[in-house]
A protein has these predicted regions:
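Acidic/histidine-rich alpha-helical segments that form the ligand environment
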Residues: 18, 23, 80-122, 132-151
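Hydrophobic alpha-helical segments and helix-packing faces
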Residues: 8, 15, 41-45, 53, ...
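Small-residue-biased structural context
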Residues: 11-15, 19-27, 85-90, 134, ...
Length: 182
C-alpha cells in the first residue's frame, strides 16, 4: 500500500471538498438520519458538522497561527463536545452553511501564508501528543476531515443495522470487521 508525502496543495484540495461532500450526503435528510448516533457520547452526523465548525474556529488554524508566531506554541486542550450546547436548536442546513463559510475563509488564510518547507517544519506543542510540526498539524487536519466524512456515513449505515437482517456479516461498515469471503 502506497503512502503519500505531505503536499500542501493536495491537502488544501481535500480540505476544500469536505463541506461539499458533507452537504451532498446530509442536506435535506430526515431527522433520524441526521441525529442518529452509535450510542452514548458518540456523534450523530449533525454533531460531526458542529464539531467541524468548532475545529475551524478553535483548533486547526488557531494552532497553526501559534506555530507561525514562533513563540511558545503550546496548544490549549481541545474539548471535542464543546459544540453540542452551542448548536442545540440549530438546523443542519445552518450548520452546513456555516461550515462551508468558515472553511473557505480558513483555506484562503492558509493560502495567504505562502508556506515554505521551513515553515512546515516549525514546532508546536500538543497538550497530549507533545512536539508536533506545522506539517503534521496540517496533515492531521486532512485526515481528521476524512475520518469525519467516513464517520457520518458509518453512523447513518448503522441506523439500519437491524433492518438489513442476515446481511450484517457482509457489511463491514456495520460490524467494524472484514467481509467474509463467499
Amino acid at each position: 500500500m502506497g503512502r503519500m508525502e505531505f503536499a500542501l496543495d493536495l491537502s488544501i484540495d481535500v480540505l476544500r471538498r469536505t463541506p461539499g461532500a458533507l452537504r451532498e450526503m446530509l442536506s435535506g435528510v430526515a431527522e433520524p438520519w441526521a441525529r442518529g448516533t452509535e450510542g452514548p457520547e458518540t456523534f450523530s452526523p449533525f454533531d460531526v458538522i458542529g464539531h467541524l465548525i468548532d475545529g475551524e474556529e478553535t483548533d486547526w488554524v488557531p494552532r497553526a497561527l501559534l506555530i507561525l508566531a514562533r513563540g511558545p506554541a503550546r496548544f490549549e486542550p481541545y474539548d471535542r463536545f464543546r459544540h453540542q450546547a452551542r448548536n442545540a436548536g440549530r438546523s443542519l442546513e445552518s450548520l452546513l452553511d456555516e461550515f462551508a463559510r468558515l472553511r473557505a475563509a480558513n483555506l484562503e488564510l492558509v493560502r495567504s501564508w505562502r508556506l515554505t518547507p521551513a515553515d512546515l517544519d516549525l514546532p508546536g506543542q500538543h497538550p497530549a501528543l507533545g512536539p508536533v510540526t506545522l506539517r503534521q498539524l496540517l496533515a492531521a487536519w486532512v485526515v481528521h476531515d476524512l475520518g469525519h466524512v467516513a464517520q457520518a456515513a458509518r453512523v447513518m449505515a448503522k441506523q439500519y443495522k437491524e433492518a438489513v437482517g442476515p446481511w450484517v456479516p457482509y457489511m463491514p461498515v456495520l460490524t467494524d470487521h472484514e467481509v467474509p469471503r463467499s
